[in-house]
Amino acid sequence: MQMPRPTEEDKARFRSLVPDDPRVQVRAMFGNLGAFLGGHMFAALLGSDIGVKLPAAELAALRERGARPFGPTGRGMSGYLTVPEGDDAAELLARAAAHAATLPPKATKR
């Protein structure tokens, strides 16, 4: 299976949607991008799809609006959904970052 690759425009759009917060890091991951806060990935770019990690109740509401599983296999990564067309992606990424901020920071790797 080949991993979807984003265009430079996709990458620029993703970066523009990530909250402007000094705690947030955008890092390359397998040719795609991930947004992290406290070591927790809260959003990712896979090809042209943007996925967010939100609390279960918010994921359920997002599913009702047409969100589909997010991940390279089509099966989906646990806790992540693809931002549906027409949704306010910047708002969803901000909510995902706020959720990540409530989690204890992950230990840094040496």
Regions picked out by a protein language model, each given a short descriptive name:
Residues 1-110:
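Charge-dense, helix-prone N-terminal extensions
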